[in-house]
């Protein structure tokens, strides 16, 4: 430098991946059914601001999105593409980046605060991203010329931000954002939420159907296995039925892959004393502890507290402690024992905590480095794998027998979505659905992939019992360490609300889990008819909340509202 041979300069280098130039030649040509759906969407946008794309699994919805994004960019508009899970951004990012290059920005909570700030600043700059792909928080980014919002897998409950506040549903927020900016909204899914489908059926939204899979691939065959009967006849001991074991072996030996779905992580959901029935429970929450064999701890899945595994029952002194039920850890152990030659991976919250774990597990399975993938609901959310020929749903009953008015809807969605991972490009797939209730009407809908029949049954129930989409639902939660205090506070709140809302108020009541992190919980349900003045409702609720806070007896009681709960 002293001799003038080298020059120094300062340049600001951002954390963001700038990518390359967009290359629209890398887009795939739409098939006949896809092109027809694309044309119908564009036509619907002439009359409707929101359109629902109801396309079966593996029908090629993503490719339609890519063509819609291209059209928006060519019209000098920005696009927001929302996904329910960070895991889904892993597979879709490369597909979009190949086409849109540096015009694509990624935004989700796995990024550091500094990275997210840079994306925010870029969106406010003179050269923002044309396309933002992200999870629910991406809906809060600034857009100068938003033209299209795509909400993929719109039925997913993951779009609801629950805790901490602010509580919002990204789908509803996206629709409102589009309305405020003059943009169009496309909701895409194979299993629409009842609310969205009802809006489409009543003409509020446009509706476009894509009823066949890409390149004519058949929907998977679904076989129901009665595990109760198999256990009674002593033909099944572990979590996998003989039929499922045989089909998984056949898939692995034939160079194909299998997915096993168990929506429960850990080794076993319960430890129990054979002599007296004692079950270890969390000291801070009203729940039993889940055994995690990898860490040799019992863990609370609500507060995260970990406890040592007892060797002796503290209630009766017996050493006969055994586990009940099976989580993904136990399934993994049993599968590894049954198929020692197979390469097995597990995908749940425990295995995806570390940075890059999502990507590694998905990439290994997509590239054929894993033969059998065991997982929770993460594996049923729009992931696309070519070699999967067998899917096992190990416990359908746990999804159906849940105390919630959405239980059947959510169970159908989960089973249909997981089933859709089978038989994508290698012929028709097979789904083995294990249950103790083979005659349940819901399972018939799943086998026939008959969303219409499910919708007609559930919508009639919702109307009869005044549930969404025929009412607005609000839950009022009250929390305090002292159960007596929260009981009195909830009764006072309930009485106050009844003076204003009458029989629209239900409760207070104890929720299924009535204590979390040492706080006792009470819940009040508010059912409001459509068309009610929501501004006045908010005014009453805030007045009630303030009245409770001003009362010296209840000043320390936490009160919050969950509007349109999931």
List each language-model region with its residue ranges.
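Hydrophobic residues on short alpha-helical segments
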Residues: 38-39
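Short beta-strand elements
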Residues: 500-511, 553-562
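Short proline/glycine-enriched turn/loop segments at secondary-structure junctions
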Residues: 512-515, 549-550
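Inter-lobe coupling/hinge segments of SF2-like helicase ATPases
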Residues: 25-31, 35, 47-130, 134-487, ...
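Short, low-order "capping/linker" segments at domain edges
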Residues: 23-26, 515-527, 561-566
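Short amphipathic alpha-helices in soluble, non-transmembrane regions
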Residues: 489-495, 535-547
């Amino acid at each position: 430098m002293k001799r003038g041979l080298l020059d120094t300069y300062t340049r600001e280098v951002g954390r963001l991946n700038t990518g390359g130039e967009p290359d629209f030649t890398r887009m795939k040509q739409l098939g006949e059914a896809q092109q027809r759906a694309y044309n119908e969407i564009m036509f619907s946008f002439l009359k409707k601001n929101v359109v629902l794309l109801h396309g079966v699994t593996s029908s090629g919805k993503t490719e339609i999105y890519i063509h819609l994004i291209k059209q928006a960019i060519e019209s000098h508009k920005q696009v927001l593409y929302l996904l329910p899970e960070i895991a889904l951004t892993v597979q879709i990012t490369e597909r979009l980046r190949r086409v849109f290059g540096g015009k694509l920005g990624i935004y989700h909570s796995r990024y550091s605060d500094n990275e997210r700030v840079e994306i925010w600043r870029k969106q406010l700059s003179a050269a923002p991203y044309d396309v933002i792909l992200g999870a629910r928080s991406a809906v809060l980014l600034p857009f100068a010329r938003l033209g299209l919002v795509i909400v993929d897998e719109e039925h997913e409950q993951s779009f609801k931000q629950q805790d901490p506040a602010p509580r919002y549903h990204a789908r509803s927020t996206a629709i409102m954002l589009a309305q405020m900016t003059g943009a169009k909204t496309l909701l895409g899914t194979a299993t629409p939420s009842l609310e969205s489908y009802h809006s489409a059926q009543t003409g509020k939204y446009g509706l476009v159907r894509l009823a066949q899979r890409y390149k004519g691939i058949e929907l998977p065959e679904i076989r129901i296995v009665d595990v109760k009967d198999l256990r009674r006849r002593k033909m099944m001991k572990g979590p996998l039925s003989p039929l499922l074991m045989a089909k998984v072996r056949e898939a692995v030996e034939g160079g194909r892959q299998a997915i096993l779905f168990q929506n429960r992580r850990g080794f076993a959901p319960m430890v129990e004393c054979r002599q007296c029935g004692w079950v270890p429970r969390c000291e801070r929450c009203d729940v039993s502890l889940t055994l995690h064999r990898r860490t040799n701890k019992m863990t609370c899945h609500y507060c995260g507290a970990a406890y040592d595994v007892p060797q002796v029952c503290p209630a009766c002194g017996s050493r006969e402690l055994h586990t009940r039920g099976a989580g993904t850890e136990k399934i993994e152990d049993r599968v590894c024992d049954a198929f020692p030659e197979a390469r097995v991976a597990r995908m749940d919250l425990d295995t995806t905590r570390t940075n890059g774990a999502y990507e590694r597990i998905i990439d290994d399975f997509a590239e054929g480095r894993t033969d059998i993938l065991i997982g929770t609901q993460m594996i049923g959310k729009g992931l696309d794998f070519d070699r999967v020929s067998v899917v096992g749903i190990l416990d359908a009953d746990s999804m159906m027998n849940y105390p919630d008015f959405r239980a059947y809807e959510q169970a159908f969605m989960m089973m249909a979505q997981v089933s859709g991972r089978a038989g994508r490009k290698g012929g028709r797939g097979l789904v083995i659905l294990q249950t103790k209730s083979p005659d349940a009407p819901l399972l018939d809908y799943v086998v026939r992939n008959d969303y219409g029949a499910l919708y007609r049954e559930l919508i009639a129930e919702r109307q009869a019992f005044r549930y969404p989409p025929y009412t607005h639902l609000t839950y009022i939660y009250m929390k305090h360490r002292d159960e007596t205090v929260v009981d009195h506070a909830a009764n006072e709140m309930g009485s106050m609300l009844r003076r204003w809302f009458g029989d629209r108020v239900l409760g207070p009541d104890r929720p299924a889990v009535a204590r979390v992190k040492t706080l006792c919980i009470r819940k009040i349900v508010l059912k409001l008819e459509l068309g009610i003045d929501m501004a006045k409702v908010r005014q009453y609720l805030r007045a009630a909340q303030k009245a409770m806070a001003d009362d010296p007896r209840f000043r320390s009681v936490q009160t919050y509202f969950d509007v349109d709960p999931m």
